[in-house]
Amino acid sequence: MLSPAIITLPWRPDAAEHYFAPLSALPWAMLLHSGFADHPHNRFDILVAAPRATLLTRGEQTWVDDGETVVVSAEDPLQLLQQQLDRQPFTPQPHDDLPFLGGALGLFGYDLGRRFERLPSHAQADIALADMAVGIYDWALIVDHQRQQISLLSYDDPQQRLQWLEAQTPTPGETFALTSAWQSNMSRQQYGEKFRQVQAYLHSGDCYQVNLAQRFQASYVGDEWQAFRQLNTVNRAPFSAFIRLDEGAILSLSPERFIQLRQGEIQTRPIKGTLPRLDSPPEDAQQAEKLANSPKDRAENLMIVDLMRNDIGRVAVPGSVRVPELFVVEPFPAVHHLVSTITARLSMTLHASDLLRAAFPGGSITGAPKVRAMEIIDELEPQRRNAWCGSIGYLSYCGNMDTSITIRTLTAWQGQLYCSAGGGIVADSEEAAEYQETFDKVNRILQQLEN
């Protein structure tokens, strides 16, 4: 049983940014950041780079590179990922204060779902980033904000890894700037037409809820890491992440957990229901109360809770699925969200990768029933979602997993920045309110980058 060697570094609250900045241009350098959030899930930042192996999925094929050979396979990507984890000689016991003990970390894009469900191909695939981009890492730097402790863990010599980290010199990147205004992929009129098409599907009994999104696009120059740091400081989202790949970067400021697995215990926290924050504290408190008591938002949230209970129930110990929290209002810098919590116990014979597959992509960003909602999304949204509404996270050698839903997430590719926003449409949704909600969710991000 091989466990990692661990050394403790002197405390500094910005350790993740300090050590990541010189690595930020390296392909496969990745940072999971708790966004300095005033939030119970803000505890850990996790930094990795220089993986032992990588897996890149595009469409039907996955490239598995173990550093010596590259194998191209048409097998299930999450099965290939599990095989890579099983191949490593590391079997650490879970550790309360170190959530990630090496293992797989990276991006699972929304369109990876096409490998698990049969979906049509109407939407244009215009961004050539991978559907899955995951590294297998044998070291990590973990910043624990609650205990104010920085741990460098490695299955090799952590002192050597520390020397490597400290020898990295930042290359001053070009200053980040947008070079065009944000443009949506649909006009107000087109959004209205798509909204009414969703309503027709809802009223004919095809589905109960569909998440409809618009995508904003702008051209830019400069260093994406600079943009992420600027956004991260202001948005303070507990599931933030920066991922550097060969062909682009992902900047995620997500408030939403998808699935956490800790020592066999499953937790998922779908967000459904949103209202903008208000400047006046009494009015803001009233706004939170309004969201908590909104029949429409509660109905939307309950549909997704039922969907997630069903998804998780496929791999959970029978009878273990519970809903300890229903309709809790959580404040974030720009919006209030309505959040519920579902828990369960993973069946003893299954892995984290089986749980991820069973629930992917998250129901909170598709609608219900999930597959029919995904078919309608593919028909009505002009382009594929790519990284947006997928997941970023880790599957640790110890069996633990934690993943986000990649909402409030930007994709940087070939000098273009893409940022999408959507909302769950139900039978009593109002078109103007749903359209406005897409702006409430990302205005803060879009405007920050314009300045």
Specify the residue positions occupied by each region the protein language model found.
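Extended alpha-helical targeting/anchoring segments
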Residues: 1-451
